[in-house]
Amino acid sequence: MKTYQDWLAVADKDENTRMQFIRQLITEHKASDKYKQARDGEAYYAGQNVTIKRYQKFIYNKFGQAVPDLISANHKMATRFFYRSVMQANTVLLGNGITWDNGEGAKALGSDFDRKVMKAGRIAQVEGEAFGFFNNGKIEIYGYTEFVPLYDEEDGFLKAGARFWQIDSNKPLRVTMMELDGYTEYQYDKDHPDGFVKQEKRAYITVKYVSEELGEEIGEFRNYPTFPVVPCWANEFKKSELLPIRSTIDAFDLISCKFANNVSDAALIYWTITNAGGMDDASLAEFLDKMRKLHAANVDGDQSVQANSVDVPHESMETILDRLEKQLYKDSMALDVDQIASGAVTATQIEAAYEPLNEKLDGYEAEITDFIYRLLKVAGVEDKPTYTRSIMVNQTETINAVMNSAMVLDEDYMTEKIMTVLGDKDKVQDVLDRRAETNINRMSRGNANTQTE
């Protein structure tokens, strides 16, 4: 693992030395365990179980040698549990957007920041670490599979990094080396295997204006007070959310595949032919072909034909699959909606079902908030983000509780609370404005009537 100090050792040397370091940096990054875990996380998130894909069934021949089984069924299915778990956490915490204390954060981070922070959260959960680049009022999100961080050995802060991308192995490798005082563009391709500078180092901010005296455009270059790329994690361990549940997902998928394979294999009917020992393999094949076509057979004398099938022991497999599914929800602290999807569920039961998810989201929220504060520091503004979690509620019970508290709550709070329960929080201000306008009109008419009298 290379650090910021390793980069400083070559930062002031010639470009060839720098490009050699950058190429080695990316190579080591791709060979690291964390990078491989990030790639696997993206595969599981996309519904591709890499463990199952690599799994090969074998059979043993008469010599006791293991050879690939190319005859029996070999289904390779993968559950999308990890996708559901990540989406659930992201949607519940960030689905309603971010509310700002004074509005400066929304102005500084851009109108689409709600979408960008959801992307950062998703990548952090899946890959273990995401990165947000504050690009002059716009946020760009990178994953661990496309950005090499260089942390300072002394204070632990991110001080530099290389963002890289390559469409295909036979296409050019593009690299943006990002430092405190600017960024440099490099490219590696078949004509330039050692790389070349595609764009010289330049500052992150370019301010252009026209001089009235000289009549020409003048540019001013600036940088940010801190490194404009900040890390984002999803948990205190700074690891992918896949790690603690991967083995359980593999077990679930493996048993599901075995279940399907057994059903497929057992669905085949095999035939027992009595008193026909003289039939060779060719005769047996001809017999089976006729059975498939005619569904009937002629037998002589004391010969007989009997169809047989195999019953799959499905009860034990269904039991273990059900147990593994419950274990997945428990270990991932996800909400099993089946617990609250049927019947009349009280608000207390809903809160109890949400408790594990809320506990996980408390830690997730702390990491997201830290990520946002780091971006605000780069932008040079101060604000406080808050979140409205998107959770299922018993609307009738909740609204009745609000109405029963009318004596101690003001009308604006009650309106906001009820509309949030109904899913219309974004329309609260419009309703409050219309009600205020109605009250003003009512007072105006009342004053007019008083003057007339």
Which residue stretches match the model-derived regions?
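Extended, helix-rich architectural segments
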Residues: 1-139, 453
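Short N-terminal secondary-structure initiator segments
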Residues: 1-49, 237-246, 271-298, 331-341, ...
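Short, hydrophobic/amphipathic alpha-helical patches that form generic packing surfaces
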Residues: 84-88, 126-130, 246-262, 416
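Short glycine/proline-rich turn/loop motifs
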Residues: 85, 97, 303-311, 438
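Short amphipathic alpha-helical segments
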Residues: 105, 109-117, 244, 248, ...
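Extended, regular secondary-structure scaffolds
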Residues: 121, 125-230
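Extended, charged amphipathic alpha-helical segments
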Residues: 211-345
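C-terminal helix-loop subdomains that flank or include functional centers
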Residues: 285-289, 294, 298, 312, ...
